[in-house]
UniProtKB/Swiss-Prot annotation:
Family statement drawn from the similarity comment of this UniProt entry: Belongs to the RNA polymerase beta chain family.
CDD domains: RNA_pol_B_RPB2
Keyword Nucleotidyltransferase tagged: yes
Enzyme Commission number(s) of this protein: 2.7.7.6
Record-given protein name: DNA-directed RNA polymerase subunit beta
Keyword Nucleotidyltransferase belongs to the record: yes
Record keywords: DNA-directed RNA polymerase, Nucleotidyltransferase, Transcription, Transferase
Catalyzed reaction equations: RNA(n) + a ribonucleoside 5'-triphosphate = RNA(n+1) + diphosphate
Length: 1378
């Protein structure tokens, strides 16, 4: 299928092997976060997330009901600073929230204390400052740093039933139910070893479940009726009879069924079929005998009362025995609880037995008879042990636990899950529990225990949902407001007099809200430093799903099941992409086509199948909706009309693969690639790679550094374009039009919409630093005169090539050993790659220094630094800052700074020096910013911020002037273009209309009724034009005025835009208190490929560069071309990533076919265009590429030439995941490219020129350079800083630390008997302070190293002992001998 037919870009043609035309475009990869945040801030004009949160907290009343605070409305302001400013100045990109609050003062009746009316109403607007705003690139800027809030995958609220192995009794299963709210107390129901049903609230002590029911207001009889079928036993002629109910005998029958006369109608142990039961009823069986032995262990359902005295003989739930039965026989009938019925057991009866004892004790201590009140008190005591309690407080407490919307929230999702699981019909707006919920949950748990219910799988995606940024922020806001609500209530109690003077602002402290939100963004586990290495890292970071974070799992405690791939992940969560290490399986990524619905459940797309015919209707289903449906894979054979060819299809149902008839199939996968996520779908031939290697491949693509020149892969998957489309790095046209002007820094597009012409301007960003210090640079990919559509990519970002993601380079590789240098995955690289800067990347480092206001004076940024040689400051400008373009080496001064010294009385010598050299010399101390040991590069930019009220230095003024000039030029260019366009349109208008009078236009005279020539009209100036227009009809004059007005308005808009930019430029710099000047220096470093750098392919085939070989020494092909990279063939078989072999085959085909197209260009025959078209059609002659063929036929000569030039460097292929090139197609391509069928070739040794004995696999593979660069890892130290207490060298490159010589290394030296080395390690190279000083002195003077002293560790130990009040004395060995 050709992706060029609907390709918005049209810059590159790929030979696309996908089988299935894309039914729906891949949804925007970042829509989940965008939609979620828009909902939170009400950017889609519904009820916003913020409003919901406010309404859940307000109104707040005071305890005496005198005052109430109500929320009226909220309004969101505009951001004060632009994104760029926030990043440069270390600010937060945020908005202010204006909240309107109403305070009502009520009139109260003095006697009754009830509200009588309203005394006063006050409304006030309260500002909540700094609510971070999401940027258009779906990230947040917090204190100048770009961060991402990761989506959380957590357990959905609702009810869940589990079956687990008992921790106390072997081989016994324990059944539990949990009601999980979004906010509030958890409720656990659980069986114990003795089959008693208990309940726990919030993991506190368990109480029998009947205690909870009683606390909810149920009487004993009500509970029995709710849980047990009541069976009435009639006493006739000393026999116990009951009505025949076939449902009681659905399972195996425990006793013979006898009729009234004692005749056996059905024997015990035999199954009673439905047919047999109907027959028995037909035969007149109404009453059957209830065996006494069964009756003996039953319980009474209702109390038995003596009819004469009215005395209760036996209470309900009395266990029947022979003596009791003898007494009961006097009654005509009695009721028993049928605990032998289907799906019930004795759990509730056992619970009553347990709670009876507790209630008896409570009755005595509390002097209350009502069991419901006692139960409430018992629950209160369990939840708040040790607190005194009264019954009303206990009842209110139980009610608050589950039925108060302020304390308990199931959310809409939880209510939906409860209703679905328990078959309830509670309206979805009821987000608190109901009594029915609790009863039904206990009932269902009993059913589960007795094999009748369905056990839930907590890893099923129907039981896990996604909390995105909007919901996470709403939760944080709720926490902040809850804190504020508590503070307001406290303030209410302290208010006594002067209630009339109270204003809303006195009660509300908005800081509480702000700090909660800022804490979430700066310290929350889900708010992360954005991974910005390349566009892919950024996109996948924003699509990440984490099971960790607040309210989620803890990685140390997460088991294997949670981390494992679940059947419901299909099409929803990528099974490949997850980190290696302790977070494996806890951090996942959304699949490519997956969407998240309003309730937070992940949906996968399918096409509907009706009677074996695939329709074009696409449906998105959640894991729960998909249960029980038959789903066919996308690879199912379908004819041209959409009918499934084969009668039986391998379909999926609930995670199982089964053979289903085609008529039974209800859905079919949208496409094969829907299973995997974005990063995995970039790996061609993924289906041939082992899962572990695919995981490494998808993770390593995120670590690829942007290279100096990007080039798209020859073997792609078609996904490269989608990522470039949704990543913010590329510049996309906002509106369609024609490219009017383009240079390296800007693009101007002239277009026309309903209102008329307009000009859009796009600036190219250059040399910006990303979070990972990679270089961010944009360059245009359109030419002047190109027609551009809205949404089209007009400029590439980093790691992009012609609007496609390009994270690496196509390299010619050979799988062969090379003198042992590619042992253990090492990589041998040709010098040509280094010489041509193929894998060179640019990294930008930021260094900053502040000048502060100190008590002794102010620090100064200056070139005038004491005790520094002239040549050391030669590269600084007059203001003391390194000039742009300076080559920086380690130890050089980047910014000169002097700090005032505290005033000490000067010595006579100092006074003399000051008298000679002026005041400055002795007062200040050098505090300059120096380049660190590993920093080397070129200064590319400098930013200077000066506090208001302080004078700007020359450098800052120059920088300001330069930026202002650039803005003025851009504005001037746009105005010129507008003027030119206006003149052209006016001339076009007048050239079509006839004159009303004789006129001289330019050099020609025109008579009345003639039309002027457009070339003459274009020669005249504006002023002449205004007089000329009067010679035309009123209609033309009106059209002219409309045109003029439109252009006038457009110019006003441009002026307003320009003024806004100038205003931003002229804004005062905001700096932290005490800082008067901030200087940031940006240094760009070129990192060429070096020995020790890590490289990788896309299939998890990683390695370290082991040697760089001269081009002449590398093995070469028969045509003389030498190989770029030699890889070890042993890296393939055991790793099982065969995808790399297929990729290199297809890559070689692309190169060879490209060479053939280049030959046609080189020959440049008369009809070479025909030859080119024929060649390109030949390449697309494979049946699967019919659409490409049609497309190439439809191209104009100019377009064809454009695509052919691109193909001459290598024909680009697109082999989507699971739809790659097959064997037959490979053999056709090999023939076309004139490659041997085994894909191998003869090679010659570069050093000897001899032919290598075996034929070698040579191909073209896409290689990446990863950000584990040797330059950033290599580190050496001779002397340096030491730890304060232990006096041992500090550790780590960042602190310029030493290499740790640990316990095990000491053992190694002991084993070798290397005593002197060992002594040196433990003393002068570690913590012998005097020893190391004298050793250093001796070495510098060329003397012998003196004897070592006592290590500091010894003193640390003795001082530790002294701190324990132990007197420790140290004796010298020599003194001891005396």
């Amino acid at each position: 299928m050709c992706d060029m037919l609907d390709n918005k870009l049209g810059n590159r043609l790929r030979v696309d092997f996908s089988n299935i035309s894309k039914q729906i475009e891949i949804p925007n990869l970042l829509q989940l976060q965008k939609k979620s945040f828009d909902y939170f801030l009400n950017l889609d004009n519904g009820e916003s997330g913020i409003e919901k949160v406010f309404k859940s907290i307000f109104p707040i009343h005071d305890p005496q009901n005198r005052l109430s605070l109500e929320y009226v409305s909220s309004e969101i302001g505009k951001p004060k600073y632009t994104i760029r400013e926030c990043m440069e100045r270390g600010l937060t990109y945020s908005v202010n929230l204006k909240m309107k609050i109403r305070l009502t003062l009520h009139e109260k009746d003095e006697k009754t204390g009830e509200k009588v009316g309203v005394k006063d109403i006050k409304e006030q607007e309260i500002y909540i400052r700094e609510i971070p705003l999401m940027t258009d690139r779906v990230s947040f800027i917090i204190n100048g740093v770009e961060r991402v809030v990761v989506n959380q995958l957590h357990r959905s609220p609702g009810v869940i039933f589990k079956e687990e192995e008992s921790s106390t009794v072997a081989n016994k299963l324990v059944y539990t139910a949990q009601i999980i709210p979004d906010r509030g107390s958890w409720l656990y129901f659980e069986y114990d070893a003795k089959d008693v049903l208990y309940v726990r609230i919030n993991k506190r002590r368990k109480v029998p479940v009947t205690m909870l029911f009683r606390a909810l207001g149920y009487k004993k009889q009500d509970i029995i009726k709710l849980f047990y079928p009541i069976q009435t036993i009639h006493v006739k002629k000393d026999k116990f009879l009951t009505e025949f109910n076939p449902n009681d005998f659905m399972d195996r029958i425990e006793y013979d069924i006898k009729d009234e006369k004692g005749k056996i109608v059905h024997q015990a142990g035999k199954r009673l079929t439905k047919k047999k039961a109907e027959q028995l009823i037909k035969d007149g069986l109404k009453w059957i005998e209830y065996p006494v032995e069964i009756l003996l262990n039953r319980y009474l359902a209702n109390p038995i009362i003596d009819k004469e005295s009215g005395e209760v003989l036996f209470d309900s739930l009395t266990l029947l025995d022979e003596s009791k039965l003898a007494k009961i026989k006097e009654q005509k009938s009695f009721d028993i609880a049928n605990d032998l019925a289907n799906g019930v057991d004795a759990a509730i009866i056992n619970s009553f037995a347990q709670d009876g004892e507790t209630l008896k004790l409570l009755k005595q201590s509390e002097n209350i008879d009502d069991e419901n009140d006692l139960a409430a008190i018992r629950i209160y005591k369990v939840m708040r042990p040790g607190e005194p309690v009264v019954k009303d407080a206990a009842k209110a407490f139980v009610n608050d636990l589950f039925f108060n919307p302020e304390r308990y929230d199931l959310t809409k999702v939880g209510r939906m899950k409860m209703n679905h699981k328990l078959g309830l019909e509670v309206p979805e707006y009821v987000t608190v529990l109901t009594n029915e919920d609790i009863i039904k949950t206990a009932k269902y748990l009993i059913k589960v225990k007795n094999g009748k219910g369905h056990i839930d799988d907590r890893d099923h995606l129907g039981n896990r949902r996604i909390r995105s940024i909007g919901e996470l922020l709403a939760n944080e806001l709720h926490l902040g407001l809850a804190k504020m609500q508590k503070a307001i209530r406290d303030k209410f109690t302290s208010l006594n007099a002067d209630l009339d003077k109270v204003m809303p602002y006195d009660l509300i402290n908005p800081k509480m809200i702000t700090t909660t939100i800022i804490e979430f963004f700066t310290g929350g586990q889900l708010s992360q430093f954005m991974d910005q290495t390349n566009p892919l890292s950024e996109v996948t970071h924003k699509r990440r799903l984490s099971a960790l974070g607040e309210g989620g799992l803890v990685k140390e405690r997460a088991g294997f099941e949670v981390r494992d791939v679940h059947a419901t992940h299909y099409g929803r969560i990528c099974p490949v992409e997850t980190p290696e290490g302790q977070n494996i399986g806890l951090i996942n990524t959304l699949s490519t086509y997956a969407k998240v619905n309003e309730l937070g459940f992940v949906e996968a797309p399918y096409r509907k199948v009706v009677n074996g015919k695939v329709t074009n209707e696409v449906v998105y289903l959640t894991a729960t909706q998909e249960e029980g449906l038959f789903i066919a894979p996308a690879s199912t054979k379908v004819d041209a009309k959409g009918n499934i060819v084969e009668e039986f299809v391998e379909a999926r149902q609930d995670g199982e693969t089964i053979l289903a008839r085609r008529e039974e199939v209800q859905l079919i996968d949208l496409c094969s690639g829907m299973v995997v996520g974005v990063a995995a779908s970039l790996i061609p031939f993924l289906e041939h790679d082992d899962a572990n290697r695919a995981l490494m491949g998808s993770n390593m693509q995120r670590q690829a550094v942007p290279l100096l020149t990007a080039s798209a892969p020859i073997v792609g998957t078609g996904m490269e374009q989608i990522i470039a489309r949704d990543a913010w790095e590329a510049v996309k046209a906002k509106r369609g039009g024609v490219v009017e002007k383009v240079d390296n820094k800007s693009i101007f597009i002239l277009g026309e919409d309903d209102k008329g012409p307009f000009i859009d301007h796009y600036t190219m960003e250059k040399n910006l630093r990303t979070n990972q210090n990679t270089n961010y640079i944009q360059h245009p990919i359109v030419k002047k005169g190109d027609i551009v559509k809205a949404g089209q990519i007009i400029a590439d970002g980093p790691s992009m090539d012609q609007g496609e993601l390009a994270i690496g380079k196509n390299a010619l590789i050979a799988f062969m050993p090379w003198n042992g240098y590619n042992y253990e995955d090492a990589i041998v690289v040709s010098e040509r790659i280094i010489r041509e800067d193929t894998f060179t990347s640019v990294h930008i480092y930021e260094k900053e220094i502040e000048a502060r206001e100190l008590k002794d004076g102010i620090e100064e940024i200056t070139k005038d630094i004491p005790n520094v040689k002239e040549e050391d400051v030669a590269h600084l400008d007059e203001s003391g800052i390194a000039k742009i373009g300076t080559h920086i080496k380690p130890g050089m001064i980047l910014v000169g700074k002097v700090s005032p010294k505290g005033e000490v009385k000067p010595t006579p010598e100092e006074r003399l020096l000051r008298a000679i050299f002026g005041e400055k010399a002795g007062h200040v101390v050098n505090k300059s910013l120096y380049a660190t040991a590993s920093l080397e590069g070129v200064v590319v930019d400098v930013k200077i911020f000066t506090k208001k009220g302080y004078e700007k230095d020359d450098r800052a003024i120059k920088s300001y002037d330069k930026e202002k000039m650039a803005l003025e030029k851009e504005h001037h260019d746009r105005l010129l273009m507008m003027d030119r366009e206006e003149m052209l349109r006016v001339c076009a208008l007048l050239s079509k209309a006839s004159l009303n009078s004789d006129q001289k236009i330019g050099d020609k005279n025109y008579k009345k009724g003639q039309t002027a020539d457009i070339s003459e009209l274009e020669k005249i100036n504006r002023f002449t034009l205004t007089t000329l227009i009067k010679a035309y009809s009123k209609e033309i004059q009106k059209e002219y005025d409309d045109l003029k007005n439109h252009f006038q308005n457009e110019k006003k808009k441009l002026k307003a835009e320009h003024d806004e930019k100038l205003e931003i430029l002229e804004k005062d710099d905001i700096l932290p208190s005490g800082v008067i000047k901030l200087v940031k220096v940006y240094i760009a470093t070129k990192r060429k490929l070096k020995v020790g750098d890590k490289m990788a392919g896309r299939h998890g085939n990683k390695g370290i560069v082991s040697t760089i070989v001269p081009e002449v020494d590398m093995p070469y092909l028969p045509n003389g071309k030498s190989v770029d990279i030699a890889l070890n063939p042993l890296g393939v078989p055991s790793r099982m990533n065969i995808g790399q072999i297929l990729e290199s085959h297809l890559g070689l085909v692309g190169l060879r076919l490209g060479d053939q197209i280049q030959e046609i260009f080189d020959r440049k025959q008369k009809d070479f265009l025909k030859e080119l078209r024929a060649k390109m059609l030949e390449i697309c002659s494979i049946p699967r590429l019919a659409n490409e063929k049609e497309f190439i036929k439809s191209l104009s000569d100019e377009e064809l030439l454009n695509y052919a030039r691109d193909w001459s460097k290598g024909v680009k292929f697109s082999t989507p995941v699971f739809e790659g090139v097959n064997i037959e197609e490979f053999s056709k391509l090999f023939k076309m490219a004139k490659i041997d069928m085994d894909g191998k070739t003869e090679l010659y040794d570069g050093r000897t020129g001899e032919k290598i004995a075996e034929r070698v696999h040579v191909g073209c593979m896409y290689m990446l350079k990863l950000h584990h660069l040797v330059d950033e890892k290599v580190h050496a130290r001779s002397t340096g800083p030491y730890s304060l207490v232990t006096q041992q060298p500090v550790g780590g490159k960042a602190l310029f630390g030493g290499q740790r010589f640990g316990e095990m290394e000491v053992w190694a030296l002991e084993a070798y008997g290397a005593a002197h080395t060992l002594r040196e390690m433990l003393t002068i190279k570690s913590d012998d302070v005097e020893g190391r000083f004298s050793a250093y002195k001796a070495l510098t003077k060329g003397e012998n190293v003196p004897a070592t002293g006592i290590p500091e560790t010894f003193f640390v130990l003795t001082n530790e002992l002294k701190s324990l009040a132990l007197d420790v004395e140290i004796f010298d060995k020599d003194e001891d001998n005396e």
